[in-house]
């Protein structure tokens, strides 16, 4: 069974910024396709749950400093893409 995907307005805004920066947007959609099919990602993308004010959200690395944040509901098979960008743009700090 495949997961369905929805996006937030913040994700769409950040996606436009990534396009403006020349990011390979197809790389992001390849990661999303794996998530849709499997509900999880290989370790190479460093998937992990976030904590504190981001509790309940997942994060992975599309590139070293290009992240995807999403909310996942395994019972409903839904993925909500909430944001994407650098550590600094998402969390206010550089990694």
Which positions does each model-derived feature cover?
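PIN-domain endoribonuclease scaffold, especially VapC-family toxins
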Residues: 25-33
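Short connector loops at helix/strand junctions that flank enzyme active sites
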Residues: 29, 45, 55, 63-65, ...
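Terminal low-complexity, poorly structured segments
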Residues: 31, 37, 46, 75-76, ...
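A short, surface-exposed loop/turn module that caps and links secondary-structure elements
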Residues: 34-61
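Residue-level signal for threonine
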Residues: 8
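Short alpha-helical linear motifs
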Residues: 31, 52-54, 69-73
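Enriched for short, Lys/Arg-rich terminal
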Residues: 1-4, 13-16, 20-23, 62-67, ...
């Amino acid at each position: 069974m495949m997961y369905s995907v929805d996006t937030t307005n913040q994700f769409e805004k950040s996606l436009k910024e990534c396009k403006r920066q020349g990011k390979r947007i197809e790389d992001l959609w390849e990661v999303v396709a794996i998530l849709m099919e499997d509900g999880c990602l290989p370790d190479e993308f460093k998937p992990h749950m976030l904590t504190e004010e981001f509790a309940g959200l997942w994060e992975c690395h599309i590139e070293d400093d290009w992240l995807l944040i999403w909310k996942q509901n395994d019972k409903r098979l839904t993925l909500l893409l909430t944001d994407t960008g650098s550590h600094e743009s998402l969390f206010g700090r550089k990694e």
